[in-house]
A protein has these predicted regions:
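Polybasic, low-complexity intrinsically disordered segments
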Residues: 266, 275-278
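Hydrophobic, aromatic-lined core segments that form the binding pocket/scaffold
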Residues: 36-207
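Cys/His-clustered metal-coordination modules, chiefly Zn-binding fingers
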Residues: 174-248
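Short linear motifs in low-complexity or flexible loops
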Residues: 249-252, 257, 263
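A eukaryotic "domain-start" boundary segment
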Residues: 1-47
Length: 278
């Protein structure tokens, strides 16, 4: 599959899967940044977490200092991982191939919607191993390691990754019901990655999937029993019901967007910060 058709077919799955392309070897013009800098330059990751923290605070009507650092760090990692994994899973389901080399991928550090993602044109045309597996072993692992070094539990971070994979499969299934079996099978295969062992229960890409850790976004909830995501491990526990409608058909599609509105993936952010950012 050539670069043009694959990019167009990914865009048909929704904005979370959309990618742009650029000529290999170019220096990214502003506001684009190289993905490698985010993964390997601590100051860039610190800035992103701070940006997300400010966004969470503004969305919830509170001061940035009232948002715990580890909550912002978890949400930032979730959004970044999800934005990378969605097009990779989409490409795999569509029978294409997408290589996300951190040194060649560009991104735009913006909030309030699916942030821009650009890859070299050759990244969409050269066949290779399963794109999701390579992404998990490379950039996603690097990002999880960098955030874990900032006192965020690796269990939480890999739970975020599992949730992102399941959410991407759910969105593919909603956009293309004919691809639902392939999307769920690809997600299940991705969840066999060693670091994801025990990260979730139930079939990924459906409302029956539950992660075994919490992304921590509930800590910004307006009150007890609110602000839980549809796939949260806390859903259904006494005094902590999930958000309304979490088990209705289509609820799984919202799981990703509910938590990562301010990280650049769009959608709502649970019951407590539903307003969209500018």
């Amino acid at each position: 599959m050539s670069a043009g058709p694959l990019a167009a077919r990914l865009a048909e799955l929704g904005p979370y899967f959309a990618i742009q392309s650029h000529e290999p070897g170019l220096t990214p013009p502003g506001p684009w940044l190289p993905l490698a800098a985010l993964l390997r330059e601590p100051a860039v990751l610190t800035d992103r977490i701070g940006q997300v923290r400010d966004g969470l605070a503004a969305a919830g009507g509170r001061a940035p200092g009232q948002v715990e650092f580890r909550v912002a760090a978890s949400v930032a990692q979730l959004g970044l991982s999800a934005r990378l994994l969605a097009p990779a899973l989409g490409a795999e389901v569509l029978g294409g191939w997408l290589r996300l080399d951190p040194g060649q991928v560009w991104w735009v550090p913006e909030l309030g919607g699916p942030f821009g993602l650009s890859v070299p044109a050759t990244a969409l045309a050269v066949p290779g191993p399963a794109p999701v597996r390579g992404l998990l072993a490379g950039p996603v692992s690097e990002l999880a390691g960098a955030v874990a070094a900032r006192s965020v539990s690796a269990r939480i971070l890999w739970g975020n990754v599992a949730s992102a994979i399941s959410g991407a499969a759910a969105m593919i299934s909603a956009a293309r019901p004919d691809l639902a079996p392939r999307a769920r099978a690809a997600a299940a295969t991705a969840l066999e990655f060693p670091a994801l062992a025990g990260a979730g229960d139930g079939p990924p890409g459906t409302a029956g999937f539950r992660r075994r850790s919490c992304c921590l976004i509930y800590r910004l909830a307006a009150g007890p029993g609110t602000g839980l995501c549809g796939d949260c491990v806390l859903s259904g526990r006494r005094g902590r019901p999930g958000r309304s409608g979490q088990d209705e058909p289509g609820a799984a599609v919202d799981q990703l967007a509910d938590r990562v509105q301010v990280t650049g993936m769009g959608g709502r952010l649970g019951d407590h910060v539903q307003d969209r950012l500018p």
